[in-house]
UniProtKB/Swiss-Prot annotation:
Positions bound to ATP: S9, F10, H17, G88, V89, R90, E98, Y123, Q124, Y125, L126, S127, S128, S129
The EC number(s) this enzyme carries: 2.7.7.3
A Pfam family this chain is assigned to: CTP_transf_like
Site feature (Transition state stabilizer) residues: H17
Assembly behavior: Homohexamer.
InterPro entries tied to this protein: Cyt_trans-like, PPAT, Rossmann-like_a/b/a_fold
Protein name: Phosphopantetheine adenylyltransferase
Annotated compartments: Cytoplasm
Similarity section: Belongs to the bacterial CoaD family.
Co-factor(s): Mg(2+)
Originating species: Limosilactobacillus fermentum (strain NBRC 3956 / LMG 18251)
Amino acid sequence: MKVAIFPGSFDPLTLGHLDLIKRGSALFDHLAVAVMTNTSKDAWFTVDERVAQVKEAVAGLDNVSVITATGLTVDLMNKIGADYLMRGVRNVDDFRYEKDIAAMNHYLDDQVETIIFLADPKYQYLSSSLLKEVAMSGGNIAALLPANINEALQARLEKRQMKRVKKENEEAR
């Protein structure tokens, strides 16, 4: 049985991520989407919120599970019996980064096999960070996210804006 893991912060999960998940689910017997924490990023959603969002987005994919963990991806792979580490790349910069991560993972565990998927050209410009930035500036990103995640992002954006306005009002006093 071919088991793969697709780790990421998914804050939020985009249609680019979902496309990779669908493609991976067609290739592997089982695909575990691992919602991880990236300490270098400012998360809008908690890990539990992201897990719930991703579960809803992949509900129709019977061979896909959604998990979470902390620590090294290679340790998680060993824990769940994953043979392959699935990654997506949008451009040359992503490839260079993923190549280095793959080399480190192989150093940590020489059984780790990284499979790199090229992003569908219609999603090559997408990143969670870019979508959050566009949303904060009032841009319409609904067509780039699963519907459930767009709703959650819009609600979170309103909450963040209300906090900002409240803070500005308090500072003005």
